[in-house]
Regions:
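Patatin-like phospholipase
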Residues: 1-40, 48-303
C-alpha cells in the first residue's frame, strides 16, 4: 500500500492556472481533498496555497487582492501583458535586414521579466514560507537545463522552490544553483504526474494546456521556433497525462499564459469542467477505495 490514497497534479500555464481554482472549488464542495499535491509553475503557486489552506475561495480572494493592488510591480506591468501584447515582445525584438531576420536582443540578457515580480507575488500570496508549515504534503517541480532533468522540492524554502518553478525560459531570469541552471517546471513536466505517481493510489491531473493551436500566417523565424517548442511540449504533456488515473482539462480558450485579465472567466471554466466530471470521478474514487479495502483485508487475513 502507498502512503496516500488520493494525489493531485496541477499543471503549469500562467493565467490559465485560474482554472485550477475553479476545479478545486468543485472538489471541496464534494469533499474531495488530496493527501499529496504536486505543482508546476502556476500549479505550484496554487498547489502551495491549497496545501496550506484548502479553501479555493480564499485562494481566489488572495489573487484578486494582489491584482487590485496598484502598488505592485505586477500591476504596473499588467497593461503590457493584456491583449497578447506581452507575447509580441520577443517578436518586436527582431529586425528584418536584407530579407533575413536578425535577433537584436543583447547576447548577455537572459530575461524580460525581473525575478522581483515573481518574488513579490509569492510573498503576497503565501502566508507561510517553508514546506514544513503546510498542512498537505506538497512537491514543487522545476527543470535543470544543464542536465535536462526534473528537479523536485518538498523540504525547506517553499517560496524559493515555487519561484524556480515559475521561471519561464526567456521571460524570467533562471536560478543558478552550483552547476545547475533552474527554470520553469513545465520544461520537463508540464503536469507533474510522475513526481507523485509512487506516492498515491489514485492520481487526478488538472491539465491546462493551451488547447487547439491557432493558425500561423506567414510566420517569422521566431514564431516558427516558438511553435516548434510548443508542439514538443504538448507531445511531452500528452505522454505524461497517460500516467494519471483521471484527467480534467478545462477549456482555457487557447489563451496565452500572460492573459491575467481573463482570470475570472478561467475560474468559471474550471468550475464547469469539474462539474461535468464530478459524478464519474466520484464513482471511480469509490470503486478504487473499495478495491483497496478488499485487498488490504485479504492480505491481512491470518491464513
Amino acid at each position: 500500500m502507498k502512503n496516500a490514497f488520493l494525489g493531485l497534479a496541477l499543471g503549469g500555464g500562467g493565467a490559465r492556472g485560474a482554472a485550477h481554482i475553479g476545479v478545486l472549488k468543485v472538489f471541496k464542495e464534494n469533499q474531495i481533498i488530496p493527501e499529496v499535491i504536486s505543482g508546476t509553475s502556476i500549479g505550484a503557486v496554487i498547489g502551495g496555497m491549497f496545501a496550506f489552506k484548502p479553501d479555493p475561495d480564499w485562494i481566489l480572494r488572495r489573487f484578486q487582492d494582489f491584482f487590485m493592488n496598484p502598488k505592485t510591480l505586477f500591476h504596473s506591468s499588467l497593461d503590457m501583458m493584456k491583449n497578447r501584447n506581452f507575447e509580441t515582445l520577443l517578436e518586436n525584438s527582431t529586425k528584418k535586414i536584407e530579407n533575413k531576420f536578425a535577433v537584436i536582443i543583447g547576447p548577455e540578457r537572459s530575461q524580460i521579466i525581473k525575478r522581483d515580480i515573481i518574488d513579490e507575488m509569492l510573498d503576497f500570496l503565501l502566508p507561510v514560507k517553508r514546506f514544513e508549515e503546510l498542512n498537505i504534503r506538497f512537491k514543487v517541480v522545476a527543470s535543470d537545463i544543464q542536465t535536462g532533468n526534473e528537479e523536485s522540492y518538498e523540504k525547506g524554502d517553499l517560496v524559493e522552490a515555487i519561484a524556480r518553478s515559475c521561471s519561464i525560459p526567456g521571460y524570467v531570469k533562471p536560478t543558478k544553483d552550483g552547476d545547475s541552471i533552474i527554470v520553469d517546471g513545465g520544461v520537463t513536466s508540464p503536469t507533474p504526474i510522475d513526481t507523485i505517481r509512487d506516492d498515491c493510489e489514485f492520481l487526478i491531473a488538472i491539465n491546462i494546456d493551451r488547447g487547439e493551436l491557432p493558425k500561423l500566417k506567414n510566420p517569422n523565424m521566431l514564431e516558427i521556433i516558438k511553435r516548434s517548442d510548443l508542439i514538443s511540449n504538448r507531445r511531452l504533456s500528452e505522454l505524461n497525462l497517460k500516467n494519471a488515473d483521471y484527467v480534467i482539462s478545462p477549456d482555457v480558450l487557447g489563451l496565452h499564459w500572460s492573459e491575467y485579465n481573463q482570470f475570472p472567466l478561467l475560474v468559471e471554466n474550471g468550475v464547469i469542467a469539474a462539474e461535468k466530471e464530478i459524478s464519474l470521478l466520484k464513482e471511480k474514487l469509490k470503486k478504487e477505495a473499495n478495491f483497496l479495502y478488499k485487498m488490504e483485508k485479504f492480505f491481512s487475513f491470518s491464513w
